[in-house]
Amino acid sequence: MADKLEQVAIRMVEQPPLYSNEPMNNPDVAIRVMNEFLSQMDRELFCIVNLQADLTPINMNIVSVGSLNEALINPREIFKSAILSNAHSMMLIHNHPSGNLTPSTSDIQTTARMQELGELMGISLVDHIITGRNGNYYSFRDKGEFPDSRVRFSTCLLYTSDA
């Protein structure tokens, strides 16, 4: 049998829309658009809303479908959607089916890490919102807990030769 390397293609496939042309410049707008979808779920869903420069949504991607009280995420899966969408910025939204909006240690660490990676890649993190039932939510930015990165990365790297 000859050695061969299979070629695969990764493409975004459109799903039925969640309608919004309104800029997601505050959590109330994001919840108005996303809560009906997320509040019906019996397990955690971790989503990214990819945004244009004026914060108008480009699309939404479900990054992870978890269990009753956790969803495993990988930064690569978050940024894959943002890069393929040519996003200027992004908003992270996930639900807590229990209705308890208190962020877990993992939620806090994920927010800090995604902000750092977003700065490095030039795709800023606008907010991370945890939604419960009945439109209740927790916004990291509104609560003043949105981490400020200690290190600022340039989004434009210059390589020079010493020769």
Predicted segments with their positions:
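Active-site-proximal loop/helix of nucleotide/amide-processing enzymes and allied scaffolds
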Residues: 1-12, 20, 29-32, 52, ...
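Mobile, glycine- and charge-enriched loop segments
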Residues: 36, 42-71
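Glycine-aromatic-enriched surface loops/turns that form tight recognition elements
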Residues: 12-16, 24-27, 31, 37-40, ...
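Short solvent-exposed loop/turn micro-motifs enriched in small/polar/acidic residues
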Residues: 41-43, 122-123
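Conserved small/polar residues in nucleotide/adenosyl-binding loops
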Residues: 159-163
